[in-house]
């Protein structure tokens, strides 16, 4: 059992809170029973799992730990004070997994052309990214594509906000808008851009079939080089005094607008 916060494993895990160390190690942290469970269900295994049984509450953590014992992950027991200092949560659940980066290339996406693709243009807030990933997963999106420079996919806030959804759908990171939209057009996807003032109201938009929903930067919206490739625009009405809506709220409403136009058999349309 590790009893010191100066142990090299603990120091390395703590450093993974910083982007430069994540990039150097190509590793990221995952906390939370749900996120770790989703990782296993999706076929991803950590290279290392730090755990503190003293912090386990209920049956979820012990049973999850037993599942991790059957993987190739290195299991490391740590003292309570060490885990509490290591955790990014107010109430640690006693498990921290260290996972390798998940690399997804655009050309390797297995899509049929009738899905929803969510394109994020230079998003900067980790919490927004996590929420959008979770919502995209919930509506059954085929992929999320992040146009760089974007917030780090593996930022602890994004990982926490996604609640494990980053393991459930492919996320592509790239910096070539022209190449992306040429690929989308070739695959039969229409690009629908979200704009606060331009285009059809959200419920009147053409959502049928393959759609790339393009969401912009929190402060500046869509960049000029991305706007040039938009096929149609959609907007949400604002009748109060608020000047804008959070991008994760806009994204959530528009993703479900697409879902209503493409209902899953057995679900409410």
Roles of regions detected by a PLM:
Residues 1-90, 190:
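N-terminal positively charged helical leader segments and presequences
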Residues 26, 120-124, 235-243:
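Short pre-catalytic strand/loop immediately N-terminal to key active-site residues, enriched for Gly-Thr
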Residues 32, 124-131, 245-249:
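Amphipathic alpha-helical repeat scaffolds
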Residues 41, 67-70, 76-81, 103-104, ...:
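RNA substrate-binding interface of SAM-dependent RNA methyltransferases
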Residues 54, 148-151, 219:
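Short, ordered loop/turn segments at secondary-structure junctions
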Residues 97, 135-139, 153, 157-166, ...:
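Structured adenosyl-cofactor binding patch, chiefly the S-adenosyl-L-methionine
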Residues 192-242, 246:
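Active-site/ligand-binding-proximal alpha/beta "capping" segment
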């Amino acid at each position: 059992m590790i009893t010191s916060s100066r142990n090299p494993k603990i120091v390395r895990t703590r450093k993974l809170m910083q982007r430069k160390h994540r990039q150097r190690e190509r590793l990221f942290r995952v906390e939370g029973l749900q996120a770790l469970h989703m990782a296993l269900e999706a076929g991803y295994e950590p290279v290392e799992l730090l755990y503190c049984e003293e912090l386990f509450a209920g049956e979820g953590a012990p049973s999850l730990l037993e599942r991790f014992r059957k993987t190739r992950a290195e299991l490391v027991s740590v003292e309570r004070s060490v885990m509490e200092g290591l955790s990014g949560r107010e109430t640690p659940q006693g498990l921290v997994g260290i996972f390798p980066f998940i690399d997804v290339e655009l050309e390797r996406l297995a899509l049929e052309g009738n899905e929803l693709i969510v394109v994020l243009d230079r998003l900067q807030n980790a919490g927004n990214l996590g929420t959008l990933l979770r919502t995209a997963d919930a509506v059954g999106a085929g992929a999320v594509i992040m146009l760089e420079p974007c917030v780090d996919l593996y930022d602890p806030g994004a990982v926490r906000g996604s609640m494990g959804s980053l393991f459930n759908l492919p996320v592509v990171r790239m910096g070539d808008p022209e190449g992306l939209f040429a690929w989308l057009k070739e695959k039969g996807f229409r690009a629908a851009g979200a704009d606060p003032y331009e285009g059809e109201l959200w419920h009147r938009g053409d959502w049928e079939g393959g759609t790339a929903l393009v969401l912009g930067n929190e402060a500046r919206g869509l960049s000029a080089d991305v706007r040039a490739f938009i096929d149609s625009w959609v907007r949400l009405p604002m009748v109060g005094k608020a000047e804008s809506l959070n991008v994760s709220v806009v994204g959530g409403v528009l993703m479900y607008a697409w879902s209503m136009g493409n209902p899953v058999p057995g679900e409410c349309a």
